[in-house]
Amino acid sequence: MNSRLFRFDFDRTHFGDHGLESSTISCPADTLYSALCVEALRMGGQQLLGELVACSTLRLTDLLPYVGPDYLVPKPLHSVRSDGSSMQKKLAKKIGFLPAAQLGSFLDGTADLKELAARQTKIGVHAVSAKAAIHNGKKDADPYRVGYFRFELDAGLWLLATGSESELGLLTRLLKGISALGGERTSGFGAFNLTESEAPAALTPTVDAASLMTLTTSLPTDDELEAALAGATYRLVKRSGFVASSTYADMPLRKRDIYKFAAGSVFSRPFQGGILDVSLGGNHPVYSYARPLFLALPESAA
């Protein structure tokens, strides 16, 4: 299996669809895929977009945080051995991401939860910026607030992709053409510098393990759903928003709402997922990425 690891050096980002005043740290793979579709159309029209959608073995993780040399993954939605103290429970709740190499110690209850909780602040900080919107025909600007995440200097987001060499080559080409990701890009959010890096062994994806944690906001196909749910522990996230296309309709229209499994969900059986069409009556399909990459949880946690 061919793979490439990309590091996105962001300053400020606005990710998530829960309103302007909130923002998440990570970026779901479907948000990135939408940007890839837009860039493919810009670079090569419908032909290049068709090539991207036809990449049947291309798999993406969500964009997840790194701090220095450490690549962080979502806290698994899995039972954790604990002494049951209220302090341990409070510390565990503060942990959103942890180094992939520490998954085993976290799940078997030997990790330093205080250190892992403190590590969250090394990613960056949430903040709110005051803005003003000026509308035609109005003298006064309407104030509004935008939530964003500011990364520390040695922190950012990483993406792992697997696929054929030609698929990874197309992905790299498109990524290099994108200037910013997420919302409020005209306000300076989401700009990044892109570099490639060597993927550590702790991030090796697999489908061969008793417990598989998805690194991607994803969804099984209808035929896979029942089997995937057996023994799974998961969180559902609503994916929605407006279509970013000037040719889709004469006015901004929303995508079809869909619920997916959040990254960090744990399954005993892998699934393939797919590329969904979430259009609602517009002039062309609107593609939503829902294929997972899985990471094996240590056997002692299975």
From Swiss-Prot:
Record has RNA-binding as a keyword: yes
Key words, A-Z: Antiviral defense, RNA-binding
CDD domains: Csm4_III-A
UniProt cross-references to Pfam families, sorted A to Z: Csm4_C
GO BP: any one term: defense response to virus
Disruption phenotype: Deletion of the entire CRISPR-Cas locus (cas6 to cas2, Rv2824c to Rv2816c) decreases resistance to plasmids encoding spacer elements about 6-fold.
InterPro entries according to UniProt: Csm4, Csm4_C
Other comments on record: Encoded in a type III-A CRISPR locus.
Family, similarity comment: Belongs to the CRISPR-associated Csm4 family.
Protein name in UniProt: CRISPR system Cms protein Csm4
Gene behind the chain: csm4
